[in-house]
């Protein structure tokens, strides 16, 4: 967590939020940088999540940093989390009450890779069509 919110575009390390703004600034702080990558950042209040593959710092303890182990593809988990929104009307921390109990179906590793490849192929086609329409 950053000690100071004295951000500057001159600094090197991005400070992240899992929400819409994503990079909220840059810090010159060198301690506590998350550099065991890739990770998924998860906002405990909004349930937004993002896959991150570059070193960063966080602004708030309301953001969880998630890693995979063994034969679990992080892209597969990130895509699964992006379509799974367990959000209600109350302002609460959703990680402990909801998401930590979520059972994610984990197919064999090669199937995870196939699913990710299919999703990315579809997204690339959508981007290509959108660009052609612009």
Provide a role label for each language-model segment.
Residues 1-104:
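DNA target-recognition domains and sequence-specific DNA-contacting regions of bacterial/archaeal
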Residues 102-134:
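Amphipathic alpha-helical coiled-coil/heptad-repeat segments
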């Amino acid at each position: 967590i950053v000690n100071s919110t004295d951000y500057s575009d001159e600094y090197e390390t991005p400070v992240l939020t899992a929400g819409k703004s994503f990079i909220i600034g840059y810090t010159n702080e060198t301690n506590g940088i998350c550099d065991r990558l890739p990770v998924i950042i998860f906002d405990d209040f909004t349930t937004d999540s993002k896959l991150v593959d570059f070193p960063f710092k966080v602004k708030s303890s309301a953001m969880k940093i998630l890693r995979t182990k063994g034969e679990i593809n992080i892209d597969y988990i990130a895509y699964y989390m992006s379509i799974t929104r367990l959000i209600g009307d109350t302002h609460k921390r959703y990680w402990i009450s909801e998401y930590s109990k979520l059972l994610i179906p984990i197919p064999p590793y090669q199937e995870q890779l196939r699913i990710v490849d299919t999703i990315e192929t579809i997204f690339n086609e959508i981007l290509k069509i959108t660009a052609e329409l612009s």
